[in-house]
Amino acid sequence: MSISFDLTIDDTRDQLARHARASLEAKPSLIGMSREEMAAALIAAGVPERQVKMRISQLWHWLYVRGVSDFADMRNISKDLRAMLAQHFTIARPEVVEEQISQDGTRKWLFRFPPRGAGRPVEIESVYIPEEGRGTLCISSQVGCTLTCSFCHTGTQKLVRNLTSEEILAQLLTARDRLGDFPDKDTPDGAMVPAEGRKITNIVMMGMGEPLYNFEEVKKALLIASDGDGPSLSKRRITLSTSGVVPEIYRTGDEIGVMLAISLHAVRDELRDILVPINKKYPLAELIKACREYPGLSNAKRITFEYVMLKDINDSLDDAKLLVKLLQGIPAKINLIPFNPWPGTNYQCSDWEQIEKFADYVNAAGYASPIRTPRGRDILAACGQLKSESERLRKSERLALEAMMIAGHGE
């Protein structure tokens, strides 16, 4: 659902009012519902209770295995039931506003989701990173972010709202559409994807937002993504990255059970307070304690610690020594991330020689410490560069949106 803004405010007031009312009365999506929620929704829509289990099984297969986005394509469901489902529910994909392809094959999509309640349409970014033998989709959990990490582009955008489980899963489903990763779908000509098997083999909750500040919706989405009768992604291939929301780290291990990544970036509280301000609430001692107690932690299920390399800020050998000491005894991998510049930042990337010295010290201490190859820099798709276009709407679009909401509330 989208709006054309190439109209004057006076001429479009009635259209905008109708759109606002339609937004408030939008049909619920079946995507992102748990089986229990779907059962309740189907019964409320008139599906006989004795049929519900079978219908959920059919819908689950069509939505998550076959990847259909129109009830009409569900061929083993009667025409009458398909019509009833279409009357009460939607399974539509978000609007793909823009798709950018980097020189290295990385793809970035700008997705637009319809309003929620009295809100306005929102936009988020997702990134696909092809590698030898696998393809990773970086998914967003919020529109904007509250954490204000000083080196992160997304952190400069205010939080608009949390994404729903539907919107989180829609990023995966739409990316699979675009890559031809569903049966009977074609891969775009020239697309860089794994030669065999799935195009999307891994997902990482490392896009816009702090996933653990949207715990319930993220949990619901990831449990569906790992469902053996649905997308069927192994929990070993799903990584949730957090800046350190300590109480929910424990819940993540107990209730979701996916791989954990920590946006660390500093080994001294006084510096991390600046780089990652949530450290003031959950300092390093509390964060590391939660990591040591993460359920299932082992050499086969290591925690990934992300460490952005900032010139003359956190890249000294003393920092490397403190890092090794801090993580002692934790099965871990340390991703060293060359800082990815973005417009307006005051930080610089560490010199490559210094990054290698840092990596050599950490590696010699027994920790895998790969230097992450920057991907998608030319399309602002690299780590720390994501930022939706929602804050960059043209003035005319903002005015039209405001008029739409005013008109809707004035009826």
Swiss-Prot record:
GO MF annotation terms: 4 iron, 4 sulfur cluster binding; metal ion binding; rRNA (adenine(2503)-C2-)-methyltransferase activity; rRNA binding; tRNA (adenine(37)-C2)-methyltransferase activity; tRNA binding
Domain Radical SAM core: 131-380
Entry cofactors: [4Fe-4S] cluster
InterPro entries, A to Z: Aldolase_TIM, Methyltransferase_A, RlmN_N, RNA_MTrfase_RlmN, rRNA_lsu_MTrfase_RlmN/Cfr, rSAM
GO terms under biological process: rRNA base methylation; tRNA methylation
Subcellular location(s) per record: Cytoplasm
EC supergroup of this enzyme: transferase
EC number annotated for this UniProt entry: 2.1.1.192
Keywords of the record: 4Fe-4S, Cytoplasm, Disulfide bond, Iron, Iron-sulfur, Metal-binding, Methyltransferase, rRNA processing, S-adenosyl-L-methionine, Transferase, tRNA processing
UniProt xrefs under CDD domains: Radical_SAM
Superkingdom in the source lineage: Bacteria
Active-site residues, as the UniProt record annotates them: 125 (proton acceptor), 383 (s-methylcysteine intermediate)
Residues annotated for [4Fe-4S] cluster binding in this entry: 145, 149, 152
Catalysis: reaction(s): adenosine(2503) in 23S rRNA + 2 reduced [2Fe-2S]-[ferredoxin] + 2 S-adenosyl-L-methionine = 2-methyladenosine(2503) in 23S rRNA + 5'-deoxyadenosine + L-methionine + 2 oxidized [2Fe-2S]-[ferredoxin] + S-adenosyl-L-homocysteine; adenosine(37) in tRNA + 2 reduced [2Fe-2S]-[ferredoxin] + 2 S-adenosyl-L-methionine = 2-methyladenosine(37) in tRNA + 5'-deoxyadenosine + L-methionine + 2 oxidized [2Fe-2S]-[ferredoxin] + S-adenosyl-L-homocysteine
Signal peptide per UniProt: none
Other comments on record: Reaction proceeds by a ping-pong mechanism involving intermediate methylation of a conserved cysteine residue.
Similarity-based family: Belongs to the radical SAM superfamily. RlmN family.
Function: Specifically methylates position 2 of adenine 2503 in 23S rRNA and position 2 of adenine 37 in tRNAs. m2A2503 modification seems to play a crucial role in the proofreading step occurring at the peptidyl transferase center and thus would serve to optimize ribosomal fidelity.
Protein's name in the database: Dual-specificity RNA methyltransferase RlmN
